[in-house]
Amino acid sequence: MAASKREIREWVERGVKTGATHVIIVCDRWDYEDYPVYVDKDQSVNHEIDIRDGRNMLKVMEVYNLSMDIEEQLEEYCAWHV
């Protein structure tokens, strides 16, 4: 099931607290459950997207940049900020 805005907000807040630079929302197309992937400052967000998107029944749905305004990103239809 697609993640709710509330769930995504919680994941983004957790990412901010842990010092992540981005939160990637990934859908497992086996059971259609969404989950977060946290990108640390020593990781490449593009690499983290590439190793997941379209592989092993995974689909990257959104990318939140934690250095940008979170509320604006949450209001977008599909956030994609690498």
What is each PLM-predicted segment?
Residues 1-18:
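Short N-terminal "domain-start" leader segments
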Residues 2-3, 50-82:
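Short, mixed-charge low-complexity intrinsically disordered segments
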Residues 5-9, 45, 70:
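Short amphipathic alpha-helical segments that mediate assembly, nucleic-acid/protein binding
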Residues 14-33:
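Short aromatic-glycine-(Arg/Gly/Cys) micro-motifs in beta-strand/loop hairpins
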Residues 21, 43-45:
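Ser/Thr- and Asn-enriched, surface-exposed coil loops between beta-strands
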Residues 31-43:
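A short, exposed loop/beta-hairpin motif centered on an aromatic-Gly-Thr core
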